[in-house]
Amino acid sequence: MRLISLLLFVLLLAIQYPLWLGKGGWLRVWDLNRQLTEQGTRNQTLKLRNAKLEGEVADLQDGTGAIEERARYELGMVREGEVFVQFVAPAPKVSATPPLPPPANSVAGRGGH
């Protein structure tokens, strides 16, 4: 009886091996699902980037708006008759007087009289 129980237990383990660790086992399926989720996230990011680039390409091909915008912001160009005005934030004020030196009769200056 004990031998039969041991044999059944070993057979049960042999049957469970492919379910958990085999080529199509649960661990492999879990890993593939994780990879699929990560790839889906990367694909979505790339789709958004591609859509942005397609819009920019279409704008460059069809109109002069994008070219004019780049010329203004990247090259600092202005149209004829326009005046370029730039507002600069004021710099923080610096004190005109230098800091005072420490007093000559300080405790550190005494030689231990």
Curated annotation (Swiss-Prot):
It is found in: Cell inner membrane. Belongs to the FtsB family. It is a single-pass type II membrane protein. The keyword Cell division applies. Part of a complex composed of FtsB, FtsL and FtsQ. The chain crosses the membrane at residues 4-21. Keywords: Cell cycle, Cell division, Cell inner membrane, Cell membrane, Coiled coil, Membrane, Transmembrane, Transmembrane helix. GO terms for cellular component: cell division site; cell septum; plasma membrane. Residues 1-3 are cytoplasmic. Residues 22-113 are periplasmic. This is Cell division protein FtsB. It comes from the Bacteria. NCBIfam families: PRK00888.1. Residues 34-63 form a coiled coil. One of its GO terms (biological process) is FtsZ-dependent cytokinesis. Essential cell division protein. May link together the upstream cell division proteins, which are predominantly cytoplasmic, with the downstream cell division proteins, which are predominantly periplasmic. Pfam families: DivIC. The keyword Iron-sulfur does not apply. Its main location: membrane.
